Amino acid sequence: MPNPAELAAHHWGFAAFLLGVVGLLAFMLGVSSLLGSKAFGRSKNEPFESGIVPTGGARLRLSAKFYLVAMLFVIFDVEALFLFAWSVSVRESGWAGLIEATIFIAILLAGLVYLWRIGALDWAPESRRKRQAKLKQ
């Protein structure tokens, strides 16, 4: 095990870097507190909405459908990235890559059909969907 003198000799550059970072941080915070504005008042506690007087509260309740659609978008977007990577290397992957991509796309389509069948992509409430189904008959 190396003694402390050897460790200090090997890590002096890192210690100098850390001291420089801490010094720069202290300098930037000190200068900003000295030169920055110190205006306090009612208008400082209000949210800024592009110069428009804010109306209503900031606590909006969103439907869970928005979160579901966001998750589905992320999932299918990542899968589109996989397909893009495959399309870049389509010549190198040959027939095996084509078969694998076809299976991957089939799984994607099966997932999309499943989501469609369970109603994950329907925005209307179930009562309205039933009414519209009765009107079509």
UniProtKB/Swiss-Prot annotation:
GO terms for biological process: cellular response to iron ion. GO terms for cellular component: plasma membrane; respiratory chain complex I. The chain crosses the membrane at residues 12-32, 66-86, 95-115. InterPro entries: NAD(P)H_OxRDtase_bac/plastid (IPR023043), NADH_UbQ/plastoQ_OxRdtase_su3 (IPR000440), NDAH_ubi_oxred_su3_sf (IPR038430). It catalyses: a quinone + NADH + 5 H(+)(in) = a quinol + NAD(+) + 4 H(+)(out). Its EC number is 7.1.1.-. GO terms for molecular function: NADH dehydrogenase (ubiquinone) activity; NADH:ubiquinone reductase (non-electrogenic) activity; quinone binding. It is a multi-pass membrane protein. The keyword Membrane applies. It is found in: Cell inner membrane. NDH-1 shuttles electrons from NADH, via FMN and iron-sulfur (Fe-S) centers, to quinones in the respiratory chain. The immediate electron acceptor for the enzyme in this species is believed to be ubiquinone. Couples the redox reaction to proton translocation (for every two electrons transferred, four hydrogen ions are translocated across the cytoplasmic membrane), and thus conserves the redox energy in a proton gradient. Belongs to the complex I subunit 3 family. PANTHER family: NADH-QUINONE OXIDOREDUCTASE SUBUNIT A (PTHR11058:SF21), NADH-UBIQUINONE OXIDOREDUCTASE CHAIN 3 (PTHR11058). NDH-1 is composed of 13 different subunits. Subunits NuoA, H, J, K, L, M, N constitute the membrane sector of the complex. This is NADH-quinone oxidoreductase subunit A 2. The gene is nuoA2.
